[in-house]
Amino acid sequence: MIIARPRARFAFSDPVHFIALGFGAGLSPFAPGTAGTLLAFPLWWLFGGGATDEPLLLLAVLAFLFGVGVWACELTGRHLGVSDHGAMCWDEVVAFLLVLALTPDDPWWQAAAFFLFRAFDVIKPPPIRQLEMRIKGGFGVMFDDILAAGYTLLVLAIVKRVFF
């Protein structure tokens, strides 16, 4: 059975669903991936905006969140009947947290990062779309957004290098 549009009841029925649906952001009737990406901002600020002297700790936390996402999206995708359901937005949350971790702590850079990330996540330039079609399950759900984050960071690095 395929659940076309999950409701709050589904999200709250299992902690795994709640995580995969980005703490409910994926229930947004309009652009759930964008809602999930926006969720990364308050989470980033809640955790101190990366203000740490331990970059390896930050990397470890992001790797842990990625692993949780693989697990949560795998199970939730099975329960929804679609392996990469649009309501699952934990992938956007984690990938954009990675972008925020490597983006200057400036609202203009973060806004640019947000729009670039959303563009790359939606457009899926090569090889993102090809890999998304080949790599299935929770890992595939999470991985294509990490690639979109990589494209975002590459463009930001080029802009910073060339213009600033």
Regions found by a protein language model. Name each.
Residues 28-47, 57-61, 65, 76:
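Short Lys/Arg-rich amphipathic alpha-helical segments
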Residues 17-18, 37, 54, 58, ...:
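Residue-level signature of transmembrane alpha-helical entry/exit and packing/kink sites
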Residues 47-60, 81, 128-138, 164:
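Membrane interface segments of multi-pass transport proteins and intramembrane proteases
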Residues 2-37, 70-99, 119-150:
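Interhelical loop and helix-boundary elements at the membrane-water interface
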Residues 44-45, 62-71, 95, 100-101, ...:
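Alpha-helical transmembrane segments of multi-pass membrane proteins
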Residues 87-90, 100-101, 105-116:
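Mid-chain, well-packed structural core segment of small domains
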